[in-house]
Swiss-Prot record:
InterPro entries: LCN-type_CS_alpha_beta_dom, Scorpion_toxin-like_sf, Scorpion_toxinL/defensin. Residues 1-26 form the signal peptide. It comes from Lychas mucronatus (Chinese swimming scorpion). It is found in: Secreted. This is Neurotoxin 67.1.
Length: 96
């Protein structure tokens, strides 16, 4: 009985430890205005994702599980490109 309790405790600990490691990850998905991710077709190095990440104020990006990922993307820049588009649209509305 003690062995089962120990095994369950160890399994739960590894599960919680794994989840906490994911939260520390320095890679994040850049997002559109509607909170959707940028799709990509080729996993690994991807010029399209590199460009998207540069537009979101970070230098490195790649494709992972068919979505663009940016390394060291701050929370402020997750939707950075959308904010620029919104600002431009507002200015155009004022002009027109």
């Amino acid at each position: 009985m003690k062995n089962i309790v120990i095994i369950i405790t160890v399994a739960v600990s590894f599960n919680l430890f794994g989840e906490s490691l994911q939260m520390v990850s320095s890679e994040k998905y850049p997002l559109y205005r509607d909170d959707s991710k940028y799709d990509c077709l080729i996993n690994g190095y991807n010029p399209y994702c590199q460009d998207i990440c540069k537009l979101h104020n970070t230098k490195e990006g790649y494709c992972k599980n068919y979505f663009c990922i940016c390394e060291k993307l701050s929370k402020e820049n997750v939707k950075f490109l959308s904010e620029i588009i919104d600002t431009c649209n507002e200015r155009l509305d004022k002009i027109l």
